[in-house]
Design a protein with these regions (language model features):
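An interfacial alpha-helical scaffold signature
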Residues: 1-251
Length: 251
């Protein structure tokens, strides 16, 4: 029987596993397609799974169900989320994957215990909008204008990187996260968008939210959005490569 995997958690967080070596149903929790969620014991860990039919379509609703299950488990314990679509072909494949990655999983559980992820979206005006294209009057100038355009593009990119780096440093100093993941890109409306994930102590969520409220009032030139707390999706190292039938890939 194939298993669909949602996340890894600590076995000690689920007293019902103390006397069982086989999968135990989780009460009042269903997964993709309404399937029963099981706690699958594996040494000191518990893998949260549901039975999986390979013919099932893992669609948008399935992705929402995956996130819901991970979120519900996060309320109870430390979790290492699996990537959406992670499937183990059978019991042996699941056990083999956990055994081979046991030390890595245990290390990540220890590092992320009591932690939560907060997500900031910061939007600012692009510091260097593209210049209007100048009409070329002679063929011999085309090459020079092309090289000039390349230099201007490279210069604008460096300026964007500098501005993005300055904003990320400012956010780091304001929120003082334990770890962070940042992406920066330009969007169609001429804005620079930073997606910032901060890892913080779960007990400090309210303080973080208060800091966000005051920061948004201070930084009038930034459009800021906050979401969370979330399971630590961005701070789980990808330990193995993806396969058609996955061998256990935390997201």
């Amino acid at each position: 029987m194939a298993w669909y995997a949602y996340c890894i958690s600590e076995k000690q967080a689920f007293p019902e596993l103390a006397r069982h070596r086989k999968p135990v149903p989780m009460q009042d929790l269903t997964g993709i397609s309404g399937n029963q969620i099981f706690l699958y014991p594996a040494s000191d860990l518990a893998v949260i799974v549901s039975e999986h039919n390979p013919a099932e379509d893992l669609n948008h609703q399935a992705a929402k169900d995956h996130a819901r299950v991970v979120g519900d488990c996060f309320k109870m314990s430390t979790v290492l989320p699996f990537r959406f679509g992670t499937v183990f072909a059978d019991d042996e494949a699941l056990r083999r994957s956990i055994r081979s990655n046991q030390r890595h999983y245990a290390t990540h559980v220890e590092r992320l215990r009591g932690k939560a992820e907060m997500h900031l979206r910061v939007m600012v005006d692009d510091c260097c909008l593209p210049q209007p294209v100048r009409a070329s009057g002679a063929k011999e100038t085309v090459g020079k204008e092309y090289l000039s355009s390349l230099r201007e593009t490279a210069s604008r990119q460096r300026e964007r990187q500098t501005k993005g780096r300055a904003i990320s440093v400012q956010m780091q100093r304001l929120f003082v996260p334990q770890d962070e993941e940042i992406t920066c890109r330009t969007i169609d409306n001429g804005k620079l968008l930073l997606d910032i994930s901060h890892l913080i102590d779960a007990k400090c969520v309210e303080r973080y939210q208060n800091k966000f409220a005051t920061t948004r009032e201070l930084l009038k030139d930034c459009q800021m959005q906050l979401s969370g707390p979330w399971p630590p999706y961005h701070f789980v190292q990808r330990l193995t490569r993806p396969h058609a039938t996955a061998a256990g890939i935390p997201a």
